Structures are given as C-alpha cells and as structure tokens.
Amino acid sequence: ERHIKTHTERSDDDRSAVSVLETFLRSNGRINTSFASDDKWPNHDNTFEFVPNPEISRRPVQTFYVQIKGTRNYTEREGVIKYTLKDLAFPAFICDRVSLDPGILFVILDPAERGNERVFWKYMSPNFLNSIDFAKGSMTVSFSPEEEILNDDESVLAFCQRLEEIVERHSFVNQLERHSYSFEEAKRIVEACDEEITESIDNLSILNKN
C-alpha cells in the first residue's frame, strides 16, 4: 500500500497551471498549444507553435519549448515576483539546444484558486541562461510586471508581439551560426543592428510625443 502513488498538492497545482495557461493564451490562432502535465517529458512540458498573422497564414513560424510551474509559494515586493525554481533541468535543456528552438518558463501563481490565478513568463535568453549557476540545484527567478500575462486580449496581444521579437532575434543568431562569421564580423553586425533598433525606438518616441 505504501508504494501506491497518490495525487500530491504539487502535481495538482501543475495540472491546474496547464489548464489556466491554455485558457489565458487563447489568441485566435496565434498561439497553438500542445502542453503536457504529470512529467510526461523529463525536461520540459512540450511546446507551442507561434503563428504571428493567422488571418494571412496559418503556418507556424516558430516552435517554443515550455516548462509550466504552478505554485502557491512565492513572494511579491514592489511589484516584483520571486519564485524558487527547484530544478534546473529545463534551462539546462534549453542551454544545450540554444541554437535550435527557444524556451519559455511559465509560472502560474495560485493556479487552483479560481479567479485569483496569475500568469508570468520568462524567456530563456542567452543572457538569462548565462546568469545561472548550474552547479547549484535551484535558483530564484524574478518576474517584473512586464512579464505578467493578464487574461484579456490586449495583454495576450502584447505577449505575441514579444514573441515576434524573440523569433527575429533567434533567427538572427541562427543565421550568424550558419554563416560561421568571425567574432569581429559578428560583432559589427550586432552593433549595426543595435544602432538600427535604437534609431527605430527614438523615432517611435518622437511620433508618440507628437
């Protein structure tokens, strides 16, 4: 009898988290989920496919690996959520596959409390992955207000716009790797792109002021 498995509070939270996230990410075909729960895969919770403009084409432009965590254990101070990720398998998995599909960690707060659920996300960017001490077994992940997805169309659309930026950046990195640029060549390309991005942001700021 002692070997018979039961449903734990954590597994219940993770299952609820998957359900909550699928509800929050309804986006008229932009985000097509294929999530899994109960540790079906050892290092991730499967994927979603991103379709930027489903009214033009239903063909996905990028697959994202995901990890979905439901939790009641977190702290909030001055708008910043802090959560302890007790297993680094997912970021390690993405780090090993960094030139392939990108990864996103989703953390759902209070997933079993109907109406009180909150959804946060963290892109496994190269900078974020480089900040992890993989010699340790856990890490604290901080989420800013900009990394919260609200259960409304405007917030989900903003998240989709962030996904488009990630897809462009990820594609750019892959192109650099495929062309085997030297360090100096890659540096010049990145600096030129940074200048173009800065100029675009400045132009947007001027337009907004006018």
Name each region found by the language model.
Residues 1-42, 48-210:
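Mixed-charge (Asp/Glu-Lys/Arg
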